Amino acid sequence: MLDVNNFEYMKIGLASPDKIRSWSFGEVKKPETINYRTLKPERDGLFCERIFGPTKDWECSCGKYKRVRYKGVVCDRCGVEVTKSKVRRERMGHIELAAPVSHIWYFKGIPSRMGLVLDMSPRALEEVIYFASYVVTEAGDTALDKKQLLSEREYRAYREKYGQSFQAGMGAEAIKRLLDAVDLEGEVTELKEELKSAQGQRRTRAIRRLEVLEAFRHSGNKPSWMVLDVLPVIPPEIRPMVQLEGGRFATSDLNDLYRRVINRNNRLKRLLDLGAPSIIVQNEKRMLQEAVDGLIDNGRRGRPVTGPGNRPLKSLSHMLKGKQGRFRQNLLGKRVDYSGRSVIVCGPSLKMYQCGLPREMAIELFKPFVMRELTQRGLAHNIKSAKRKIERHSPEIWDVLEDVIREHPVLLNRAPTLHRLGIQAFEPILVEGRAIRLHPLVCTAYNADFDGDQMAVHVPLSPEAQAEARILMLAANHILNPKDGKPVVTPSQDMVLGNYYLTLERENIVGEGLVFTDINEAMIAYQNGYVHLHSRVAVAAASLGNETFTAEQNNQLLITTVGKMIFNSILPPSFPYLNEPTKTNLEVATPSQYFVPTTTDVKAHIEKQAFLLPFKKKNLEEIIAQIFKLFHITETSKMLDRMKDQGFKYSTLAGITVGISDIIVVKDKPEILAASHDEVDNVTKMFKRGLMTDEERYERVIAIWNAAKDQLQNKLIAGLDRLNPIFMMQDSGARGNISNFTQLAGMRGLMADPSGRIVELPITSNFREGLNVLEYFISSHGARKGLTDTALKTADSGYLTRRLVDVAQDVIVRETNDGSDHGLLVSDIVEGPEVIETLTERLEGRYSAKTVRHPETNEVMIRPDELFTQEIAEAIPAAGIKEVWIRSVFTCNTKHGVSKISYGKDLSTGSEVEVGEAVGIVAAQSIGEPGTQLTMRTFHTGGVAGSDITQGLPRIQEIFEARNPKGHAVITELTGEVKAIEEKANRQREITVTGTQETRTYTVPMVARLKVKVGDAVRRGDPLMDGSIDPKELLHVTDVITVENYLLGEVQK
């Protein structure tokens, strides 16, 4: 017996008729299933107990032998072996076919294996197998060729002409005879000879035939086994038939398909016994062939067999295929024990590594652990009574549960799991109620919110699994995002707002200019109302105990606010005191301009000093990243908890709310709108006089209204109070952006219609005034499109991730250095005026490929195979170096993977990557995860055909599939200069490029935006117009590195 749990791999081969018979426990002769009166399986039918085993444990069919003591006895009345009913999941039967039948996988699959072995086209095979033509199996001494097809008429004519000196046949029998006659050794030798001279199509065909024939030779399978003489019948419990309430039966589709095969097979046997005319027999054989095809792969050929309601029946192949098939549904992804799911709510008092688990859920999940502990402590005599105690919820089980879950991490998962941070480990804390409590800071990683999201809990059982969860998956360790190395646990919403409010500065407010000896004195004054959080005050610098202050600074007063003192109290003492949201203050030290001698008139000094900005979400992220860099994980997660608590506390104390009175009205709105209407009228007049085309008029109108909206927006911001709650929310980065504000208080602006073209009628109202019916209607298009896009793109993005993981999963860090001597030349990635990724960002954490020297002093800045630290990465562009050679995975020589040096540092830990890290999957998830946030739309530049450029998710798919892009740009094949750009008929332009040897002209559409002008120098592979370059064309014109660089730049966008 083979050990089912311990095997290296599975090998799939052809089963010979004898093999199928040896698996079988008997032949299924009748199509009957269950007797409708007795509900017992029919003898010799599809559920026969004699073949497949008894339906009840240790009991034969007729009831003569019952009980275990008759184990293994075969009943002399009904012939059923007394054994467990579980064997009905294991025992197979068989059907002896009255005529050979071809196996559809080998005849219809691509490429057709049967066709390759016989060197016949699939079309010819189909004609023979389905009884449309005869095939010559033995030519004898006639003028016919072996494997020649004959129609009915030709066959008759040749029979009369040659008599019995040749043999021809139809159906799978004829194919079987041909397959039996194949001489594998001889064919292989012939093909190897042919390959020496063959060219083109013949060569590829020969190679494919050779592959199949060699496979047959090595595996020991016989080609004729591709035609079935015996059909296996799978065990009945795997294709069950169950009685529903109401007396009807529900059955697996396979039973219907088997019934058709048996019916046709029996009819064919009867016809053969009766010696029926060949045309009737042929028709019956064809029907049998179709029935077997339907059973193995329904719908592969012709119309699928349908059940009630025209539903195609699920055949054996469908049981295995696709997302719902056996592999992806049951083998690779099972539902597991020791898991549960519930709604999540916020747990603001939790530590970073904790989650709240409802009691009833915890007792169910940890049941075996609790039962063991109860019996060990003597609270229960045996496992059974322990189980009863738990089911009755006896009071003593709760203390035991508390002890059991201590130090036992659980995994929390939120679907969709788009990247590895979608499953993290936490230590459970028992909570009342039925909702899971989640730490607010991990919401970003899970992309969770508390509006009814659900999460699943899984319990790692073995000590190894627990250790793995604790060391690798504990939430407190996942502070950096694996895709870019930036903090992923950043405060959001209330927490940002609280810290923003805490660090605000205001003038002429109670207690301004007071001097305090230390923070405690300041806090007492604040609690008693003598000073406000936002009051600018002075405090003795020494009392703050900050280790970054110099001796001189410690003898002085520090000008700060009460709120900033509180804010800094959560930071480590060796971290600079943060007084202003600047890089200098964060990375070097507190600027000395905020320190004044103790003799200063503080009030007068403060009045002269400019206001400092509060700390926004971006600043908080920078602080977290810096703390992580200096103090590593443990300290950072403690600090994050402190920042969270402080944020919640002060956003509550601030009492920031939103009311209609917070939405202010812009005084000059009517004048701005009137001026824009006049401009639009002017443009329309010019259009009517024929001074501009309709397209130009449309673009001008759109520009006018966009300018009006911007003007309103600027007026709004200028007239806003810095303490306006809506402004604070969007300025801090807690929620919303300035355009929300403009729509509430300014105007909604232009909207797109369902096709994506912008409607030139603007919505001049805002939400405070309310929209009229037409405006409401116009804005409903955009809203609807947004919702449908979101639904569609989630599925697309998931599928993209799946394909990316499929190709990248074998890319693993295999070695330290691959000894490659070349690398990649990197510089800023630029798109038009904006820089997408700076040189510093590209260098940090990578290894150098060549020595880099300072252009002026000529000193060595970095040697080959050394790591670019942040300092070096910043110093290089500062020295005026524009491009650098780095080691890259593109040029890595490692077999089946990459090396440490070419990959660079591990972004999720900030330290060097470990050998064995699955970097391919990390990369695939990092591209797939933001995919859901990308737009689905094709951008319409005013809806002109030809200038649509695909963006967002579809663009990413286009790059990875190396498709010919939509709106593809013409590129030059020469290095030289642009000599002329001429307009031609039928809306085309011709661009002439002259190189050193030759001149070429390129035709581009009139509407395309050109990237070059006359006199420009161009290099091979440069695009001449806007749009996406076809990577295959670029590869043809340039080299691999150029294409890799282009694709890299495109994905970065």
Curated annotation (Swiss-Prot):
Residues spanning the membrane = none
The record's GO CC annotations read: DNA-directed RNA polymerase complex
UniProt-listed InterPro entries: DNA-dir_RpoC_beta_prime, DNA-dir_RpoC_beta_prime_bact, RNA_pol_asu, RNA_pol_N, RNA_pol_Rpb1_1, RNA_pol_Rpb1_3, RNA_pol_Rpb1_3_sf, RNA_pol_Rpb1_4
What are the protein's GO molecular function terms?
Answer: DNA binding; DNA-directed RNA polymerase activity; metal ion binding
Q: Where does Mg(2+) bind?
A: D449, D451, D453
Keyword line? DNA-directed RNA polymerase, Magnesium, Metal-binding, Nucleotidyltransferase, Transcription, Transferase, Zinc
Q: Which SMART domains match?
A: RPOLA_N
Subunit-level organization: The RNAP catalytic core consists of 2 alpha, 1 beta, 1 beta' and 1 omega subunit. When a sigma factor is associated with the core the holoenzyme is formed, which can initiate transcription.
Protein's UniProt name: DNA-directed RNA polymerase subunit beta'
**Binding annotation for Zn(2+):** C60, C62, C75, C78
List the EC numbers from the record: 2.7.7.6
